[in-house]
Each structure stands twice: as structure tokens, then as C-alpha cells.
Amino acid sequence: MAQFSAHRQEWFGSVTNSNIFEVIMMADKDGNIINAFGLSSNINIAAGLVDGWATIHKFGAVPAMSQNSSGTIWDVNDTLYPWDAFDTPSALTISTTTSNGTLSSLDDGITVHVLGLDENFEEVEDTFTISGNSATGTVVFKRVYRAYIDGTTANQTQIRVSNDTDEILRINIGKSQTLMSIYTVPAGKTGYLLQGVSTCAANADATVDMYVRYFGQDSFRIGHTAEVAGVGGQYSYQFGVPIQIPEKSDLDIRAEVRSNNARVTAAFDIVLVDNEI
């Protein structure tokens, strides 16, 4: 393309050291030039127009934590997420119960989708149809990160998904989807954590920690921490340089609360990039 120097008031027609410069552009998979800066550049990634790039938005809420308790921000109060349940990959089972754990058939016939990773840490999905108060799957999972229901009405029961004897997913009554601030980066991809947010119910406060277990390590360690209070509004942090999270690494957002019946939420956004790029 023709280039013009506003400073020298001449076209860059001759090839000299002062006239040579480099123009770098970013294109989608169809060759269309796209914006490489700012929030608008992420729209093409979310739309699937950039090969090898994808996004995941994870969000969770713990309903009502007890005073001076701690746990993962997911659908079960005062409980750390049972990562050890995945030491042996297995198929899953579902039971539908009342809020106190009594089996119930109110959601007979509904469809439940479970998303996660298989024994090779690759994306898989299983679909369950509740018969009475239970269902059994066929897909083997090494990790799970989301479940949701089909239908025109919300679930009337707690939908509890188990791996052997451990509950690893729960859809609380009326929510139609899990609310869990955990995630595992799939095989063949690297995650780039862009931002995180957290809130507390009014008159509640908590310490919220992002724990990361990097693949190949046995324990989680803190990757970010925040103090969150209901009277202070939401905590929001956008990383100036995204945090790199290697494939097969686990994220677990946890809260330690100081008030009773504290509802705490957390969410984060990750861009996933194929390792071969």
C-alpha cells in the first residue's frame, strides 16, 4: 500500500533507511483484518473467528457460608471442592433431592448436560435424562466444570452429580446451572487469566483467594488474594499482564468469611490459546 510521511510531506516512494518501516496486522481465519487492541479485539475470539483461540467465563456463588468458615466458592456451603475425587476417572451418576437431601422425583424427565475433561484432559460432555430421581452416565470424566439443564422451567430439586461416592457438581433449586468458581485448563491449551471479580452480601465480608495447582504439582498455592466487603461494593481486578496458566492446571477460588450466612460470589475470564500457535 502507498504510505505518506506527514512530517516530510512526501510519499514513501524510494527505498531508503529512513523510508523502510514494518506494518503488522491481525486477521481472522477468513483473512479479514481485525482490531488487535482493546475489548473489541476479544469479540472475534468469542465469535470463533480466530483459529486456535477461545474464551471461558467462569462464575460461582456459595449460598450461605457459616461464620468463621472457609471453602470453595461453589454450590455447597463451607466445603472445599473435592479434587481428590478425580484420582480415578469414572462415569457419573445423578440424584435429585429436596434441599435436605431426601430423594425427589419432581424433576423426572428433565435433561442435564455435564461439561468437563476426560482422562486425557480433553473436552467431553455427557447428557443425562432423569428417570424418577436418578440417572447414570457413560462418559468417563477426569474433571468437570459446569452442568446445566434443558427445558422451559427451572429445576425443582437439587441436582446432585457424583463421582463414585463424592458429590462433584450441584445445581441448586431454581438455578438451572451450576455456580462454581473452579476450572481446569484443557490439554493442548494455555490459559491467560484476564480479570477476576468477587462480591459479598450486604453486611458480610470475606478474604477471597485464587488458588492454582500447576500441572505436575501435588498442592494448590495462592495466585491472587483480595478482601471483599458487602458495604464496599464488588472487588474487580484486571491483570495488566494476563496470568499464564499451563495446560492441565487447576483453579479454585476460595473464601474465608467472618460473618454468618454470607453469600460470596466470584467470576473470572480466561482466553485459551492452542499450544501449537
Regions found by a protein language model. Give the residues of each.
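Beta-strand-centric surfaces of beta-sandwich/beta-rich domains
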Residues: 2-9, 36-142, 151-277
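A surface/extracellular/periplasmic glyco- and lipid-processing/surface-interacting theme
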Residues: 147
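Short, low-complexity N-terminal tether/leader segments at secretion or assembly junctions of large
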Residues: 1-39
